[in-house]
C-alpha cells in the first residue's frame, strides 16, 4: 500500500521505509549506480538503485521513461552537493529495496518536458499530455477553485440541485446542440446553453438559494476562450436586490482568489455603467490595468475639412474619439503602420494620428498628414481636451460607433500590453475587477429588422423602464450586471422578470407573438402566475477563471479533454459517423450520405 505521494517525500521521512507508486520520468546510469526520477501528480522523488541489491538493480536496468512502477525503499539524505532546491523532495532520496514494474510503456511520441509541441500532437495524445506537471497543476487548481466555491455557497445556505441535460430548444442565443428522440419521431431535445429557465423554475418552487457547477453547450464558432461544452458556476437567489446579489458573489470571488491564489481583491469592486464603459473604453469588459481611455471629440470635428471626421461627427450612430498615448511620439512609422493594419481587423478603414512635438508652438508643433485639414480652433481644443503633452501621440477613430469601439478598444489594449506600454507605465498589472451594470435590454438586428435580447429575454428592465418595452425598446435598460476581471467577462447575471405581464411585454418587443411565446415558453409564463418571487442570479465561467489564474495561453489548457477550434476531440475522434441502423432508429435520413 502506498505510504505517501512521491512529491511529498521530505526530511520528515528520514529513516523511514516508504512505498511509492508512479511513472519513470527519467533514468540515469552513473558509474554502476542507477537513478530514476519517479513522478506522480504531486511531483518527483529521486530513487537510487545500488548494485548490491541485485534483484532491484536488475529490474532498474530494464526501466524506461513512462514505465508504471511500485518502489519500496529507505528515505535518506542526499550526499552533500547533490541536493535539488527546485524539488520539495530535493534534500532526500529513496534507496530502493524492492521495485515492481506494474506496466511497461512503449516509447512515447514526445518527451513530456518538450514545450514546443503542436496543439494537435498534445490533444491527440492527451493522456500523455495530461501527465505533464503543468497540466496536472492546472487541473488541481481547477479542483481547488470548485471546492472553495462549494464551501462558500454551502455556508450561505445554497443548495446544489441538478437540472436536466436533455431539454427544449429555444429561439434565443447561440445555436443549440440537438439530440434526436428515438421514441418521439421527428422531435429533438437540445443540450442546455445554460440552466436559465430551470433555475428560475426552482425559485418559483421555493428553493430560494440554488447553485450547481454544470456543463453547458453552445454550437458556435470557437476561439481561444470558447468551447462547445463548457463549465458554468450557476447560481440563483430569491428575495435579494441587485445590489445584494452582487455583494454575495463578489464576496465569493474574493474568497476564492484569497484561498487559492493568496490574492487580495479590492473590497468593494468598482462599479461602472455600461454607458460609461463604452464611452471611455469602447468595451463592456474594459481591461482596467491599461491606463488609457477615449476622449469624445465629435463636437470639435463637425466643421473641419477632413471629411472622414466631419462625416462621422454629424452622422447619427457614429462617433469620433481620440486616444492619447503618453510618450507615444517615440513610436516608429513601422509601428504605427502595424497598428493601422491591426485596427483593420475590426473594420477600421485607417488610423489617423497626430504626434505632439511641442504644444507651445500650436499647429507648428503638431506632426501629422491630417493637421492641414483641421483648423486652429479644433487643434487647440483637441490638445486641451485630451491633455496632450510634448512627446505624446493621439490616435483617432471615426466611423460607425461599433467600428470605432471595437477598433480603438482593441488598440487601447494592444498598446497597453506592448513592451512600450509596460515600459512607459501604461500597463499597471495586478488584478483589476470591475462590475459593469445597467446594460441595454435590446440590440437591433438590421438583417432581421427586429430587436434581439442583449443578454436573454428573461432579464428585468430597470425601475421606470417598463413602459419603454412598448413605446421604444431602444431606451430600455436592464437590471443586468457583468463581473469583469482584467478585460475578461468572468461572470454575468441579472435580476429576472417575475411577473407574467412584464415577460409578455418583452416577448412582444422581440416580435415573439402570443402563439410562439406559448409554444416555446408556456411553462415559464404559467409558472410566473403562481406567486413567483423576485429573483436573480449570476453564472461564472469556471474554465475562464482557471485560465486566468494559471496564466494558461488557452482555455484548452485547463480542461482535461477539450475540443479543438473545429469542435473535434482528437483523442476519441469525435464527432464521428454512425451506421445506418442507428440513423433508422432515430428516424433520420442523411440528404448527403458522403461524410467528409
Swiss-Prot record:
Name of the gene this protein is made from: aspS
Domain of life: Bacteria
Family per similarity comment: Belongs to the class-II aminoacyl-tRNA synthetase family. Type 1 subfamily.
GO cellular component: cytoplasm
Pfam families the record matches: GAD (PF02938), tRNA-synt_2 (PF00152), tRNA_anti-codon (PF01336)
Keywords: Aminoacyl-tRNA synthetase, ATP-binding, Cytoplasm, Ligase, Nucleotide-binding, Protein biosynthesis
The protein's name: Aspartate--tRNA(Asp/Asn) ligase
Classification via CDD domains: AspRS_core, EcAspRS_like_N
Residue span of region Aspartate: 196-199
Entry's EC annotation: 6.1.1.23
Gene3D superfamilies documented for this protein: Bira Bifunctional Protein, Domain 2 (3.30.930.10), GAD-like domain (3.30.1360.30), Nucleic acid-binding proteins (2.40.50.140)
Transmembrane segments: none
Primary residence: cytoplasm
Amino acid at each position: 500500500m502506498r505510504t505517501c505521494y512521491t512529491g511529498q517525500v521530505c526530511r520528515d521521512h528520514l529513516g523511514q521505509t516508504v512505498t511509492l507508486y508512479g511513472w519513470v520520468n527519467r533514468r540515469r546510469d552513473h558509474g554502476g549506480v542507477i537513478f530514476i526520477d519517479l513522478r506522480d501528480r504531486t511531483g518527483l522523488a529521486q530513487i537510487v538503485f545500488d548494485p548490491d541489491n541485485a534483484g532491484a538493480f536488475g529490474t532498474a536496468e530494464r526501466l524506461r521513461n513512462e514505465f508504471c512502477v511500485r518502489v519500496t525503499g529507505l528515505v535518506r539524505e542526499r550526499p552533500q552537493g547533490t541536493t535539488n532546491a527546485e524539488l520539495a523532495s530535493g534534500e532526500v532520496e529513496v534507496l530502493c529495496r524492492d521495485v515492481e514494474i506494474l506496466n511497461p510503456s512503449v516509447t512515447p511520441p514526445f518527451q513530456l518536458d518538450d514545450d514546443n509541441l503542436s496543439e494537435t500532437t498534445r490533444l491527440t495524445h492527451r493522456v500523455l499530455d495530461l501527465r505533464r506537471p503543468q497540466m496536472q497543476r492546472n487541473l488541481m487548481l481547477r479542483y481547488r477553485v470548485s471546492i472553495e466555491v462549494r464551501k462558500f455557497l454551502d455556508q450561505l445556505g445554497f443548495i446544489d440541485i441538478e437540472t436536466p441535460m436533455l431539454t427544449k430548444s429555444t429561439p434565443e442565443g447561440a445555436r443549440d446542440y440537438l439530440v434526436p428522440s428515438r421514441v418521439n419521431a421527428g422531435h429533438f431535445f437540445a443540450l442546455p446553453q445554460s440552466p436559465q429557465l430551470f433555475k428560475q423554475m426552482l425559485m418559483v418552487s421555493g428553493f430560494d438559494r440554488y447553485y450547481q457547477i454544470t456543463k453547458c453547450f453552445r454550437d458556435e464558432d470557437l476561439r481561444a476562450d470558447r468551447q462547445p461544452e463548457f463549465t458554468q458556476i450557476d447560481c440563483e437567489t430569491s428575495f435579494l436586490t441587485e445590489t445584494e446579489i452582487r455583494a454575495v458573489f463578489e464576496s465569493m470571488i474574493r474568497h476564492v482568489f484569497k484561498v487559492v491564489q493568496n490574492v487580495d481583491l479590492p473590497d468593494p469592486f468598482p462599479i461602472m455603467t455600461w454607458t460609461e464603459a463604452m464611452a471611455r473604453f469602447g468595451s463592456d469588459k474594459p481591461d482596467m490595468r491599461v491606463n488609457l481611455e477615449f476622449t469624445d471629440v465629435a463636437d470639435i470635428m463637425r466643421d473641419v475639412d477632413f471629411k472622414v471626421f466631419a462625416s462621422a461627427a454629424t452622422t447619427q450612430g457614429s462617433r469620433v474619439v481620440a486616444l492619447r498615448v503618453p510618450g507615444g511620439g517615440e513610436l516608429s512609422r513601422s509601428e504605427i503602420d502595424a497598428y493601422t493594419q491591426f485596427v483593420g481587423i475590426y473594420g477600421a478603414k485607417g488610423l489617423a494620428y497626430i504626434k505632439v512635438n511641442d504644444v507651445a508652438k500650436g499647429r507648428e508643433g503638431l506632426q501629422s498628414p491630417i493637421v492641414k485639414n483641421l483648423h486652429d480652433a479644433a487643434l487647440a481644443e483637441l490638445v486641451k481636451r485630451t491633455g496632450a503633452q510634448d512627446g505624446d501621440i493621439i490616435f483617432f477613430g471615426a466611423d460607425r460607433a461599433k467600428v470605432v469601439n471595437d477598433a480603438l478598444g482593441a488598440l487601447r489594449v494592444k498598446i497597453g500590453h506592448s513592451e512600450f506600454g509596460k515600459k512607459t507605465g501604461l500597463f499597471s498589472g495586478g488584478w483589476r475587477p470591475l462590475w459593469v451594470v445597467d446594460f441595454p435590454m435590446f440590440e437591433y438586428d438590421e438583417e432581421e429588422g427586429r430587436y434581439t435580447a442583449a443578454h436573454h429575454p428573461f432579464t428585468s428592465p430597470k425601475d421606470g423602464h417598463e413602459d419603454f418595452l412598448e413605446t421604444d425598446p431602444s431606451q430600455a435598460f436592464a437590471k443586468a450586471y457583468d463581473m469583469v476581471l482584467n478585460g475578461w467577462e468572468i461572470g454575468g447575471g441579472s435580476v429576472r422578470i417575475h411577473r407574467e405581464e412584464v415577460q409578455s411585454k418583452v416577448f412582444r418587443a422581440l416580435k415573439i407573438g402570443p402563439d410562439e411565446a406559448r409554444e416555446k415558453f408556456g411553462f415559464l409564463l404559467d409558472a410566473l402566475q403562481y406567486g413567483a418571487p423576485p429573483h436573480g442570479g449570476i453564472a461564472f465561467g469556471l474554465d475562464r477563471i482557471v485560465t486566468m489564474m494559471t496564466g494558461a495561453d488557452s482555455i484548452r489548457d485547463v480542461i482535461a479533454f477539450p475540443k479543438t477550434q473545429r469542435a473535434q476531440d482528437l483523442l476519441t475522434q469525435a464527432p464521428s459517423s454512425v451506421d445506418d441502423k442507428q440513423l433508422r432508429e432515430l428516424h433520420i435520413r442523411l440528404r448527403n450520405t458522403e461524410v467528409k
